[in-house]
């Protein structure tokens, strides 16, 4: 019997396949992106220590107050700018981008482009 896998399950499989290849170090941590139906999240992670160095999401009050909606491309752009600003304050300039199994399109692309424009290199 063939069972069709859900989109969520297929995304998780893609993410595991990507994570085998992408590793964040202290010199070049990993910028991980996750999006739910309502919010978008970004974290900068040092995988060697297992620590989250910087995070930002459209769930935060300071970001949410500037937005009309937390689930559109504008929210992703703002989260990208905020994560880049916080990373630069901590001295992080270069990162490895982890799209989390999501297609590099729409909100994920908007977050990446705005983080690049704000000064992160990847």
UniProtKB/Swiss-Prot annotation:
The entry's keywords: Ribonucleoprotein, Ribosomal protein, RNA-binding, rRNA-binding
Gene Ontology BP terms: translation
One example GO MF annotation: 5S rRNA binding
Keyword presence, Ribonucleoprotein: yes
GO cellular component: cytosolic large ribosomal subunit
Origin: domain of life: Bacteria
Membrane in keyword set: no
Homology family: Belongs to the universal ribosomal protein uL18 family.
Functional description taken from the UniProt entry: This is one of the proteins that bind and probably mediate the attachment of the 5S RNA into the large ribosomal subunit, where it forms part of the central protuberance.
Oligomer and partners: Part of the 50S ribosomal subunit; part of the 5S rRNA/L5/L18/L25 subcomplex. Contacts the 5S and 23S rRNAs.
The name this protein goes by in its record: Large ribosomal subunit protein uL18
Species for this entry: Dictyoglomus thermophilum (strain ATCC 35947 / DSM 3960 / H-6-12)
Upper classification of the organism: Bacteria, Pseudomonadati, Dictyoglomota, Dictyoglomia, Dictyoglomales
């Amino acid at each position: 019997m063939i069972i069709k896998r859900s989109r969520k399950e297929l995304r998780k499989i893609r993410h595991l396949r990507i994570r085998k290849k992408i590793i964040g170090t202290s010199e070049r941590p990993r910028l991980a992106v996750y999006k739910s139906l309502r919010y978008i999240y970004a974290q900068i992670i040092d995988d060697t220590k297992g620590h989250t160095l910087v995070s930002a999401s459209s769930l935060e009050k300071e970001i949410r107050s500037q937005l009309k909606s937390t689930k559109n491309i504008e929210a992703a752009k703002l989260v990208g700018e905020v994560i880049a600003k916080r990373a630069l304050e901590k001295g992080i300039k270069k990162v490895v981008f982890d799209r989390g199994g999501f297609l590099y399109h729409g909100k994920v692309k908007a977050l990446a482009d705005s983080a690049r424009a704000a000064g992160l290199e990847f």
